[in-house]
């Protein structure tokens, strides 16, 4: 906090902008998901699960800088250093949860005092439930977000987005006279390769100033 205050004071003396940015909000993948949710194209969102475990780190990584993985100097582990962007996206996409239950491992995989493994369950007033899993101790790991809604399932893995779209699971449950049938689905793939190749997240943030 002391160093942060120094940076703020310096920026003010030069009348310059000084900010901490969460650039993933401008990632075209999540911008599209935000549009689908806000436009009610997914219907009611029932559940999401984000498994972000491709942050694999070694003991040597934590030993290279004295500030790493210490409560006093970093303030936490995988949640504050690596997965802070995904936590921010959870809040941006789905809102603030009403309650959070978390089971975390302090130095489960590494010789550190802070968390390197986390499993959290988010509960929301509207009935939505979310699961968030992250660690720096699994290899090869995965980055996968599932969003289950009344209009089907969206899967985002390594920036590949697939929507298995249906009319309405709620209406099908109410009105179907079959035992095991499921609603017909349409598979939609979204392609963001060109935008992602240009690394436009930081560009958009800078343009926003």
Predicted feature locations:
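Rossmann-fold NAD(P)-binding glycine/threonine-rich loop
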Residues: 1-16
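A general structural signal for well-ordered alpha-helical segments in protein cores
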Residues: 4, 30, 86-87, 202-207
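Short, well-ordered coil/turn segments that N-cap beta-strands
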Residues: 16-17, 126-128
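Predominantly a Rossmann-like dinucleotide-binding segment in NAD(P)-dependent oxidoreductases
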Residues: 16-17, 24-111
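Short catalytic-loop micro-motif centered on adjacent basic/acidic residues
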Residues: 18-21, 131-133
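Glycine-rich phosphate/pyrophosphate-binding beta-alpha loops
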Residues: 84, 109, 133-141
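Active-site beta-strand termini and strand-to-loop segments that position acidic
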Residues: 115, 120-127, 147-149
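C-terminal glycine/acidic-rich active-site capping loop/insertion
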Residues: 146, 150-209
């Amino acid at each position: 906090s002391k160093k942060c205050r120094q940076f703020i004071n310096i920026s003010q003396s030069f009348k310059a902008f000084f900010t901490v940015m969460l650039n993933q909000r401008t990632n075209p993948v999540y911008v599209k998901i935000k549009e689908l949710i806000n436009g009610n194209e997914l219907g009611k969102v029932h559940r999401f699960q984000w498994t972000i475990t491709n942050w694999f780190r070694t003991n040597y990584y934590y030993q290279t800088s004295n500030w790493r993985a210490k409560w006093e100097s970093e303030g936490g582990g995988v949640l504050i250093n690596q997965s802070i962007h995904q936590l921010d996206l959870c809040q941006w996409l789905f809102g603030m949860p009403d309650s959070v239950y978390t089971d975390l491992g302090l130095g489960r995989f590494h010789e550190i005092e802070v968390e390197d493994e986390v499993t959290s369950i988010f509960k929301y007033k509207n009935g939505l439930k979310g699961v968030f899993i992250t660690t720096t101790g699994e290899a090869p790991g995965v980055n996968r977000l599932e969003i289950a809604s009344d209009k089907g399932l969206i899967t985002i893995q390594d920036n590949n987005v697939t929507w298995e779209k249906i009319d309405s699971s709620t209406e099908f449950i109410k009105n179907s006279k079959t035992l095991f049938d499921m609603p017909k689905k349409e598979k939609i793939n979204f392609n963001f390769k060109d935008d992602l190749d240009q690394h436009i997240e930081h560009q958009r943030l800078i343009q926003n100033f």
